[in-house]
Amino acid sequence: MVFLSGNASDSSNCTQPPAPVNISKAILLGVILGGLILFGVLGNILVILSVACHRHLHSVTHYYIVNLAVADLLLTSTVLPFSAIFEVLGYWAFGRVFCNIWAAVDVLCCTASIMGLCIISIDRYIGVSYPLRYPTIVTQRRGLMALLCVWALSLVISIGPLFGWRQPAPEDETICQINEEPGYVLFSALGSFYLPLAIILVMYCRVYVVAKRESRGLKSGLKTDKSDSEQVTLRIHRKNAPAGGSGMASAKTKTHFSVRLLKFSREKKAAKTLGIVVGCFVLCWLPFFLVMPIGSFFPDFKPSETVFKIVFWLGYLNSCINPIIYPCSSQEFKKAFQNVLRIQCLCRKQSSKHALGYTLHPPSQAVEGQHKDMVRIPVGSRETFYRISKTDGVCEWKFFSSMPRGSARITVSKDQSSCTTARVRSKSFLQVCCCVGPSTPSLDKNHQVPTIKVHTISLSENGEEV
């Protein structure tokens, strides 16, 4: 990260003419570092646009990801170009004042990025541990306050050298060296890396424990019966639920379990994606924060200039690879990236021609007819359906819950009297409204046709989302 690379520790305070530049080496470094910087800038811009242009990504978790992308974008656009020029030329060409400002901005952006990952880890712990209460715990206001605290703490850590907390600067202004003042190195290493890292590791360890426990609990509630057609039926049982009770209470229990399973599966998948981000962060930054304090407190063990430059740029690399991680580990981001690259911004509502249309036959026919895998479970005056199609150990689970008629735009097909077609726009995961109509068309124009909200999710045999 941070305080700036430099090879000034072996230089004198006397002004010396810059060494001649090796042209072939400069061109090679320029191409490699320039490509890395360009990739980081464009990738982080793509992350920001993907969230900004898709309403279903307008959540507190994704705002944290945008904050991470903003910090990385500032680093790759305002710090890395000067770092690359420094490496290519072999000396600092922008003066002492700008060297100090550049160093402070470097520390600011890197610290904000690391603390942003810390906030994300806490967010994922809450999401996995309390999936149903998450929206009330993590509100937009609290999310904004957390981000303000991140940048405030980052600013406090970064401005110390601007107020004199550093070793005396060399007289030669072509030298822009790293701040090796032991007190500041310890303060910045603890505040910028080790304390956030400790929080991140604790949070993700707890996420792992909770996810394992919840997966076992949810799996125990899935009772399946195999048939010759390799179709299985989902039966929901609420743990510790009373044996007796009204049908309404039982139905509410089943619905609550289903919603809990959906929310937990989504939060767990998000935690996996961001866990990969954190893993890459540790691999990129840990070498630097091991080398830096050792070189400051034990000069005899200071690594060579080449080793220092490698671990220094390895930390910078972290700000460029996050945009690769999102689409590779999240289908949600992959589709959002594709839409942005195709200039298909979805800020506005999609037109009806892009809406998903589904036709559903009456449930009585589905249960008694050819669709033996469709099970009808009464939920009060409404209905819930569960279906699992088993293929190579992967099951597709569909949860149908009734919803108000006004939530979907309903059109009755004149050619198909056995069903009614409903259309609705998909959101963060597949959400489709289907209408179950009577087997014969109704003569009453004001007849209220019930609608059904469909949630589709793929589960493996152990109940985990795939």
From Swiss-Prot:
PTMs per UniProt: C-terminal Ser or Thr residues may be phosphorylated.
Any one GO BP annotation for this protein: neuron-glial cell signaling
Expression (tissue specificity): Expressed in heart, brain, liver and prostate, but not in kidney, lung, adrenal, aorta and pituitary. Within the prostate, expressed in the apex, base, periurethral and lateral lobe. Isoform 4 is the most abundant isoform expressed in the prostate with high levels also detected in liver and heart.
Main location per the UniProt record: nucleus
Lipidation (S-palmitoyl cysteine): C345
Effect caused by changing R342A: Abolishes targeting to the nuclear membrane of cardiac myocytes
Record's keyword terms, sorted: Cell membrane, Cytoplasm, Disulfide bond, G-protein coupled receptor, Glycoprotein, Lipoprotein, Membrane, Nucleus, Palmitate, Phosphoprotein, Receptor, Transducer, Transmembrane, Transmembrane helix
Disulfide cysteine pairs (residue numbers): C99-C176
Record bears the keyword Ribosomal protein: no
Variant or mutagenesis effect after changing R348A: Abolishes targeting to the nuclear membrane of cardiac myocytes
Compartment(s): Nucleus membrane; Cell membrane; Cytoplasm; Membrane, Caveola
Glycosylation sites: N7, N13, N22
SMART domains, per database record: 7TM_GPCR_Srsx
Family stated for the protein in its record: Belongs to the G-protein coupled receptor 1 family. Adrenergic receptor subfamily. ADRA1A sub-subfamily.
Subunit relationships: Homo- and heterooligomer. Heterooligomerizes with ADRA1B homooligomers in cardiac myocytes. Interacts with CAVIN4.
Name used for this protein in its record: Alpha-1A adrenergic receptor
Encoding gene, per UniProt annotation: ADRA1A
